[in-house]
Amino acid sequence: MRTPVVMTLGMVLTPCGLLLNLVSTLAPGWRLVKGFLDQPVDVVLYQGLWDICREQSSRERECGQPDEWNYFQTQPVQVARGLMITSLATTALGLLLASLGVRCWQDEPHYGLAGLSGVVFFVAGLFSLIPVSWYNHFLSDPDVLAAPSSPVTVQVSYSLVLGYLGSCLLLLGGFSLALSFAPWCEERCRRCRKAPPAGPRRSSISTVYVDWPEPALTPAIKYYSDGQHRPPPTAEHRDTSKLKVGFPMPRPPPKSYTNPMDVLEGEEKKTATSQGGSSSRSTRPCQNSLPCDSDL
């Protein structure tokens, strides 16, 4: 898997910010002082947090100059020393966390750890930005930052500029790495939705059961409402009340007897002889093979 862009950007900006802050802390170049009355015109003093250097065009730079104005005892210098060292230590901790979070030897990055390193870098940038801004605010104030009287000129030197750049790089790199919290939070929310509830879910609305008194009914209404006026079902009704299971089968059509012989054959002869009397009707044999009416 490719490293996300926010992690790559953060891992590029934060080491650069650490390097610039380190140079700004150690180099004697926070303030430039020139224009001394009792010194040559080309004499320049570079004041830092730990040392003061003297530079002249005809000579090389000489460091370790004595502090004639109690410059190192001023409050902005003392605070800047402590905060810049704290910023360097915090940045080193952030690099350690970022190395573990931005997987250099794993397939998947640890988004939570990378986001935490971004927060640490952001705090480190604030630790370095506060003393740099405070020092720059009182740069030309002799009551806060000790300096010789006029016509001495006080200017910003290179270490202060490097401190500004290093702080901004740490802030940007920390913010970029802190964006790694977005996929981490999304994954956590997805797991919380899929996880089953730990216990039985309680309803937010409680159900209240109220036993209302039954209304008093007249004897006639109670008699008819209870069904007492209905006679008990008979056996015939019980049989018909049973449910019939299944589906109706088709019934075959009724069968009828068909005679292939003509049943009216011989009826004319029987009609002619019927006048002879009833006795002769019963004694004559029937010429039809079918049963005759006299046989019935």
Curated annotation (Swiss-Prot):
Pfam families cross-referenced by the UniProt entry: PMP22_Claudin (PF00822)
Subcellular location: Cell junction, Tight junction; Cell membrane
GO biological process, alphabetically ordered: calcium-independent cell-cell adhesion via plasma membrane cell-adhesion molecules
Ranges of the Extracellular topological domain: 24-81, 133-160
Cytoplasmic side: 1-2, 103-111, 182-296
Its membrane topology: Multi-pass membrane protein
UniProt cross-references to PROSITE patterns, sorted A to Z: CLAUDIN
UniProt entry tagged with the keyword Cell membrane: yes
Annotated TM spans: 3-23, 82-102, 112-132, 161-181
UniProt keyword list: Cell junction, Cell membrane, Membrane, Tight junction, Transmembrane, Transmembrane helix
Biased composition (Polar residues): 285-296
Region (Disordered): 224-296
Compositional bias of kind Low complexity: 273-284
Listed GO CC annotations: bicellular tight junction; plasma membrane
InterPro entries xrefs: Claudin (IPR006187), Claudin_CS (IPR017974), PMP22/EMP/MP20/Claudin (IPR004031)
One Gene Ontology molecular-function label: structural molecule activity
Family designation: Belongs to the claudin family.
Described purpose of this protein according to its UniProt entry: Plays a major role in tight junction-specific obliteration of the intercellular space, through calcium-independent cell-adhesion activity.
Protein name listed in UniProt: Claudin-23
Organism in which the protein naturally occurs: Mus musculus (Mouse)
